[in-house]
C-alpha cells in the first residue's frame, strides 16, 4: 500500500544499546509480583518514535529544498534536536524540537529544510543535550510542487450586512483600491465577483474612474465575472436565466471588452441548464463557492462528524466539466465556501499561511486521492460578505511568495487558473451532468405573495419585448417616434435589471429573523421589494400601452386586442377587466363569456396566433352570470368528473374520459388538500444557526383544511365550477374554486386565503396525491427539463424542487401534468421533515411548497395577509412516440395568461390587419425563449429552445419583423457568422437537441455588420 502524498513512514528504529538479559528478567519478575506490579512498579516507558513528513513548502529561490516536519513521541525531555544527514553522511540540517502541545503524549515537533528533488534517503539522529537517544533512517519523496491561484474577490450580498446601497459602495471602494494598488503591485489581480460590481462602479464614479476600470479589465489587470449577481436560478423563468450574463454582455459590447469566466458564490447549487446558458453567453469557466447552510448533504465530512451526524457527505474541492442537456459545458471549480484568504491565514502572516496551506494540501481527502493527480488548485475568495479589502492580505501574500517557491501562489483572475488547468489537464478531467441543488430557493417562500408576483412579472417582461417588435409599424417615423421607442427600450432594460436583482439571493438582513422589527430588517426588505414593485408597475403600463398601440392601428370601431406571447396558437380562458355585459367578436363570432360579480368577465378565447394578436370588436351583450347549481360536492363537465371530500374539501376523486381514478387513497384525503405544518424549531429542519440541533428530529404539528360549504355554479358556454369555503387554523378566510371546462383538457384550481402572521415556525403545503406507484417525474426548469434523481448530482437537493411551468408524472402510458403558476417550489412523497435525502424514489404524491419561515437569517421571519395559489391539472400520457413538446405547451398556458388590452375605439381603420404575429415559426417543437428589438437598435434578436428532444434545422420567417439578412448571436447579442436568407425570406437556424440558438434579424434598410 502506498503512503499518502508526501508522507512516508520511517524505517524501523535501531537502538543505540541493547539492555542486558539479566536486567530484562529482573524487571519482568518484579512486574509479575501482585503487590509490587500494581503499586510500586512504574509503567514501562513508551518507545521513542520518529516521523518525518515532507510538506508542500519549497524554499526560494530555486524550490529545491523542502520543509520537512519532524515529530517525536515517547521522549521524556523538555526539548530535543534532530540532526538530518544525507546518505553520504553530510549534515543537511538541524531542527529544534519543542513540545507539540500541552496535552500529555503530544510529543515534539520541529521543521528542517532538506534538499528534495527526487526520492532520497536520510538519517535522523535525535539528541537531548549532547547525547543521541534515537536514530532512524527514512526515505522521503518530494510532494507535488503546487501552484495555487488565488481568486482575490469579496462576495457580493446586495444587502444582508447593511443597507443595499452601502453594501454596493463597499465593492466600489474595493475596486478603487484595486486600481490604486496596480502601481505598486502590478502583478496582483483583484476580481469583480459579478458584473453588478462593475456596473455599479461605472454608474457611480466619475467618468475618468470608470474609464480606468474598463482599461484595467481590458488589460487583464482586474477580473470581470460575467454573471450579473449571485442568483437563485430555480426561481427564474426561461428568459430571465437566459439573461444571467446579459448585463455583462451588454457592458462588454459597449466598451470593447471580453470575458471568459463567471462566479457564483454563497448559493449552494444551481439548475442543470446553467452550463448551457453560460456557454451560450460566451462563458467557458465557472467558479463557485457553495455555502452549505440549510443544505445539509453539502456539508464536508469533517463538519458533519463534528456535530455528530452520519451519512454521505460532499468532498471539496471539485474540478470537472459541467455539461448541460445540450452538450454545452463549462469548466467548473466548486470550492467549499469562500473567503479562502482568511481561512488560510492571509490576514495573520506567512507562517500561518504556510502551516494552514500545508495541512490542507497534505490532508484534504480530494488531494490525497488518486482521482486528483493535478498540481494546481484555486483559493476561492479573499474575505467574507461585503468586506472592505484588508491590505494585509496583499502584503502577507507577497511576503509568502518571497519565502516560498512552492506552493506558488498566483493572484490571478479566474480565467488564469482555468486556462492553466485546461491546457494541461483539460482532456483528462471528468464530465458531470445534472443540477447541484436548489436549496436556498425555499427561502423565497417566506414572502409567498411577492414570489407569485415575481413569477408573473418575468413572463410579462418577456411579453413587453415581443410587443415592441411592432413599434416600427405603430410609431410615427419621425424623431419623436424614435425617441419614444428609445425611452421604452431603456425602461425595459431597467425592468430586467430590477427583475434580476429581485432574483438575487439576498432577501434581507442578517438579523431578519432574530430582529424582525429591526431597522435593518425593515429597511432592507422594503428596498428589496421595490425592485419587484417598480418592475411590476412599469410592466403594467408597458403592456397596456403596447397592446393599445397595436389595437389602435387595426380595424375601425370599439375593440379589444388579445395577445398570445407563447410560441403556439392558444385556445384558453381569459379574464376581461370591466367586461361584464360586454362581448368580444372575432370574424363575426361572439366568444363565450360569463359575467362575474366583480365586473369582469370570464371569456373563452379561441385560436389566438402564436407570438401574435387578434384585434376583436367589442359590443354589448346579453347578461350571462354564473348559474347557481346549489350545494354540491360533485361536478362533471367535458371529460372530467370531480368529487370533493366531505371532510376536507379536497378533490377525493378525479377521473377523465377513460374513467381511471387519478387520486391515490391513503394518508391524504385528495388533491388540493391544504396542509399547515407548525413546529420544528431547533431541529433537523435547520431553523437556527446552531448546527448541533441538526441531529434532533423535528416535532411537527400537521393540520389540514376542513370543509365549511360547497356550491356548484354553471358557467354557461364555458364550464362548471365548485366554490368551496374551508377553514384552517391560522387562516381567517379560505376559499377554493375548482373549474372544469366544456372544451379544455384540464381543470383549474384556485385557493384564495387570508393568513395571520406568526413568528412560530410554519409551512403551508397543498397536497396532490396522484394514483401512481413508481412514476417518472419530469420537471421543467429554466431553459430545459430534468428527471428527478436521474438528472441530479450527488448532494443535490431532494427535499424540495423548483419547476418553471410544469411537473409531469407518468408511469407506463398514463400521466398527469401539474402546474403551479404562483409557486415554483414543490416536494415529493411528503412534506419537509428534515430528512435531507441523498436519494429519492417518487411515489406519486406531490406537494406545492407554498410558504415557510424555516430560515434563521436573510429571509422573512413571518408573513401574513392575502395570498392566492393556483394550479392546473391535465391528463397527459407518455405513450412512445408522443409529442414531447406538449407538456411545455400546456405548462406555459397554465402560467402565462392571454394578455388583453383596455378598450379602445378607432375612428377609422389602421395599417395593421385584424390578426398578426411577430415571426413565423412552423416547428411546433420550438419554444421562443425571447424575441426583442436588439439592444443596439440593429434589428431584432430571437432566442429559440428545442423542446422536442431532437437536433434539427428550424426555419424562421418574417411577419411583423421583416428582415433581409441575419447573423448568429449568442444569448448576450454578440454577433457571430452570417446566416443566409432564402428566396422564401426565411432563415434557417441549427438547433441542438435540448439546446438554444439565437440570431439577429436585420430589418430594412439596415445592413448586417
Where are these regions (language model features)?
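CE4/NodB-like, metal-dependent polysaccharide N-deacetylase domain
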Residues: 241-280, 359-380
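Alpha-helical scaffolding within the catalytic cores
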Residues: 134-136, 174-177, 204-217, 243-246, ...
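Mature N-terminal, pre-catalytic/accessory segment of carbohydrate-active enzymes
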Residues: 2-155, 1005-1009
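C-terminal (or distal) subdomains of carbohydrate-active enzymes
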Residues: 57-63, 274-279, 288-291, 318, ...
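Metal-dependent polysaccharide deacetylase catalytic core of the NodB/CE4 family, i.e.
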Residues: 158, 186-188, 192-265, 328-334
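An acidic-aromatic substrate-binding cleft motif
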Residues: 133-171, 177-182, 188-189, 228, ...
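Catalytic grooves of carbohydrate-active enzymes
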Residues: 324-552, 565, 749, 814-903
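Surface-exposed loop and adjacent secondary-structure segments within mature catalytic domains
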Residues: 211-220, 271-345
